Swiss-Prot record:
Example GO biological process: protein catabolic process
Origin species: Dictyostelium discoideum
Protein name, UniProt field: Proteasome activator 28
GO cellular component: cytoplasm; nucleoplasm; nucleus; proteasome activator complex; protein-containing complex
Gene3D superfamilies linked: Proteasome activator pa28, C-terminal domain (1.20.120.180)
InterPro entries according to UniProt: PA28_C (IPR003186), PA28_C_sf (IPR036997), Proteasome_activ_PA28 (IPR009077), Proteasome_activ_sf (IPR036252)
Compartments where found: Nucleus
Physiological role: Subunit of the 11S REG (also called PA28) proteasome regulator, a doughnut-shaped homoheptamer which associates with the proteasome. 11S REG-gamma activates preferentially the trypsin-like catalytic subunit of the proteasome. May also be involved in cell cycle regulation.
Subunit note: Homoheptamer. The homoheptamer associates with the 20S proteasome.
Any one GO molecular-function label of the UniProt entry: endopeptidase activator activity
Underlying gene: psmE3
Family membership: Belongs to the PA28 family.
Amino acid sequence: MSKNNSTVIKMDEQVLKYKEDLYEKTVHHLKVTIPKKIAEYQELAKSYGQNSENEQDGQTSKKRKLDSEDYVLMPIEDLIKTNRVIMETHQKFKKAYIELIETFSVIRGWISLNIPRIEDGNNFGVDVQEDIITQITKLEEVYTSLLDGSESYFASRASLVKKILKHKDIEAYRYSLAQVDEKEFTRFSFSYFDLANNYATTYSLIVKNFAKLETPRPTNASNIY
């Protein structure tokens, strides 16, 4: 083969098909999935803050009425039980974090495959693509870390319960346990707000720059709407 001849490799049809599938899923997420999630988590954050009367918040409110004195008077067999509402809410957050990671990984995958070949000249659209990929990657890392650290509450509570069982006369451990549980309920409210906020800010960034993400070099780009 002559040194002047270069090998031409065309994009495989399966890869193009996969890219098109990611594009369709991306548009669906931007038009349906993400706006729905923003509204859902906004409402959940509000209901936790206002102690609304729905079933979940009714249970939560009931549990939150237990102040530090209740923990001091509570029988040991009840004290060592993990709060059922907290356990159930942890499972809901785990599901929510996984859904967020999956949703934005699809969008990140499509943007990555849609980056054009490297050329001299105007690469502003490509820079936008790379910046948004970076933002999405950071968001995924945040929620991956939250998944990994979700057991920290249970570990802290278990440690305090062990101390309570060993030192039944020291009320300070019971007060500490009350604070750990109350702190977890408070964190839930902020966590729902953070989910809504992170969905909204990332969604806004993507939609505002969608023309450059879809067609990074030509100026006659289309819009998802």
